[in-house]
């Protein structure tokens, strides 16, 4: 678009607001062949600070991360104390005389699949403040694993992938209010690897130290750290649904303090812009005055 320019003492002067990350390329043409065009941000829309709790929407199920378990090798009677899963992998390898995994080990597909020599049995304790039906377990090697939940055998038929082509979803039975027990038995050997598993569903999660608890999904959330509001492990998109009142037929949305790739802004379901760089602004003009719903997707 034509720049806002003027001529003074034989010089061309360009007036331009410049923000962090901005860059401009100007094409200088013959004098008076293009009329100057002033482009300004309208600040006549009024201003209000949005606070408090608002409705929200998740783009996918919430997540309970299970990365610590008790374990035993097939043939052992007692489970060993709870430990972080990658350390457990090396503990199991040491018990079976297998070389430990490390940052420089050869990838398992280089030498092909090696037959398992035993089984690793992992036990997870899952605490819940609610009864919940419809949970999904996401794990690697789902079809090779034997899974029980609260002593009931779990059908390990794969529903679909989760996040990665090597992580699979299987349906879990009802999660009971109180303490639940998940046991996963994997064939184990030189080619095997133990990894974290995930429980997915429409529930909240609280974390206190190493203790995680399933809770009811929050009805509303506030602006700020979502990890303390029921979503410590959630990695999908989150949309804040904010009631706003439009005056002067315009709306400027400024959101400069966020952690994410960008914020998608929509008004009553219609996109009005993406907020990623200074001045962290999305604008809507020529809109009807009155009550609307602003949606900010992070």
Give residue spans per PLM region.
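Non-catalytic C-terminal accessory modules of carbohydrate-active enzymes
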Residues: 2, 18-19, 225-226, 233, ...
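Solvent-exposed beta-strand/loop surfaces of large extracellular or lumenal domains
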Residues: 1-14, 142-143, 147-168, 264-282
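Aromatic-lined ligand-binding clefts that engage carbohydrates, nucleic acids, or primary amines
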Residues: 126-150, 182, 244-269, 294-296
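Short, exposed beta-strand/loop patches in secreted or surface proteins that constitute
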Residues: 3-7, 34, 47, 55-56
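Extracellular and analogous surface-interaction loops
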Residues: 118-135, 172-175, 240-251, 284-287
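C-terminal beta-strand-rich structural cap/linker in extracellular carbohydrate-active enzymes
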Residues: 10-38
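Ordered hydrophobic segments in well-structured contexts
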Residues: 1, 23-29, 121-123, 136-138, ...
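An acidic-aromatic loop/edge-strand motif
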Residues: 43-119, 141, 160-165, 170-243, ...
């Amino acid at each position: 678009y034509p720049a806002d320019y003027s001529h003074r003492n034989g010089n061309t002067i360009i007036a331009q607001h410049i923000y962090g990350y901005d860059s401009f390329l100007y094409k200088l043409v013959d004098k008076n062949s293009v009329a100057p065009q002033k482009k300004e941000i309208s600040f006549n829309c009024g201003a209000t600070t949005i606070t408090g709790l608002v409705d929200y929407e998740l783009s996918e199920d919430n997540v309970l991360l299970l990365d610590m378990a008790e374990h035993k090798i097939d043939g052992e009677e007692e489970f060993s104390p709870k430990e972080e899963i990658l350390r457990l992998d090396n503990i199991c390898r040491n018990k079976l005389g297998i070389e430990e995994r490390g940052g420089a080990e050869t990838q398992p597909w280089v030498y092909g699949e090696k037959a398992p020599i035993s089984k690793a049995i992992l036990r997870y304790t899952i605490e819940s403040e609610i009864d919940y039906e419809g949970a999904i377990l996401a794990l690697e090697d789902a079809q090779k694993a034997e899974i029980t939940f609260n002593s009931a055998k779990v059908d390990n038929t794969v529903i679909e992938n989760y996040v990665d082509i090597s992580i699979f979803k299987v349906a879990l039975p009802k999660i009971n209010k109180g303490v639940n027990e998940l046991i996963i038995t994997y064939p184990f050997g030189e080619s095997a690897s133990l990894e974290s598993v995930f429980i997915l569903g429409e529930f909240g999660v609280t974390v206190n130290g190493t203790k995680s608890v399933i809770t009811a999904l929050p009805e509303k959330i506030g602006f700020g750290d979502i990890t303390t509001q029921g979503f410590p492990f959630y990695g999908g998109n989150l949309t804040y649904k904010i009631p706003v009142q439009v005056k002067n037929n315009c709306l400027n949305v400024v959101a400069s303090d966020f952690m994410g790739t960008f914020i998608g802004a929509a008004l009553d379901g219609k996109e009005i812009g993406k907020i990623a760089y200074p001045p962290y602004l999305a604008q809507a003009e020529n809109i009807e005055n009155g009550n609307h719903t602003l949606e900010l997707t992070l």
